[in-house]
Structures are given as structure tokens and as C-alpha cells.
A protein has these predicted regions:
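Alpha-helical promoter-recognition and RNA polymerase-docking modules of transcription initiation factors
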Residues: 4-127
Length: 128
């Protein structure tokens, strides 16, 4: 009876902690917030750049899961590496995006993220 009680209490604690953490990534910015960040970045605001990057980390994980499922099935280390490399592409996108050209940031960022991952994978294959 005590072990059953311990089991129930442990699971309640786990559920409580899980609900408290909600998400490992910040919520995505609204279109207005995103545009405001992009305008501030164009004016040289480093804090706006960091906010834009942090709020698009979930997008990097989505692209890795969608475009590189073989790496996700391989090991968590492979997935973490691809997300890290994809984040470098996201940083590049945040620094070079031009809103006046009419495209959405997510469209531009997806290409930058994918290019960073593809470039790194080609570089690794050269040394194998």
C-alpha cells in the first residue's frame, strides 16, 4: 500500500512540474511584434535582435524535425547538433533580413536555417 501511495505522489509531482514548465521555447511573436523587432534591428538595436532570435527557436526545431527526420531518429545528440547549427542560420537571418523586399521573416529564416545545416553537413562529409 505504501509503494502505491509513493508511486501516486511521485507522478503527481511529475505532472505538477511538467505543467509548471509549459514549454522549453518562448512563444512566437505576433506579426506586429516581429515587425517592430525587425525595424529596431535595422536601427542597430541588439536587444531586439536577441528577442527575435529567442522567439524563433521553436521554428528552428520545427525545421530540423520536418527536413531531417533521419537525424531525429538517430540520436538526441544529432538532433541537438542540428538545432545548434540551425540557430546559427537563424542568427544570420535576423541580421540580414530586409522587410522592404516584401517577404516574411519566417520564409527568409527557413532558407537561412536550411542553408546553414546543409553547409555544415557537406563540410562534415568532406572529412569522413
Amino acid at each position: 500500500m505504501i509503494t502505491l501511495l509513493e508511486f501516486v505522489l511521485q507522478n503527481l509531482l511529475f505532472i505538477g512540474l511538467h505543467l509548471d514548465c509549459r514549454s522549453s521555447f518562448p512563444k512566437q511573436l505576433s506579426k506586429a511584434e516581429e515587425r517592430e523587432c525587425i525595424e529596431k534591428i535595422a536601427a542597430g538595436d541588439a536587444e531586439a535582435r536577441n528577442v527575435l532570435i529567442e522567439h524563433n527557436l521553436r521554428f528552428v526545431a520545427y525545421i530540423v524535425n520536418k527536413n531531417y527526420p533521419e537525424s531525429i531518429r538517430g540520436s538526441q545528440q544529432d538532433a541537438d547538433d542540428l538545432i545548434s547549427i540551425g540557430t546559427i542560420g537563424l542568427i544570420r537571418a535576423a541580421e540580414t533580413f530586409d522587410y522592404s523586399k516584401g517577404s516574411h521573416f519566417s520564409t527568409y529564416a527557413s532558407r537561412c536555417i536550411d542553408n546553414a545545416i546543409t553547409h555544415q553537413r557537406k563540410h562534415i562529409r568532406q572529412f569522413q
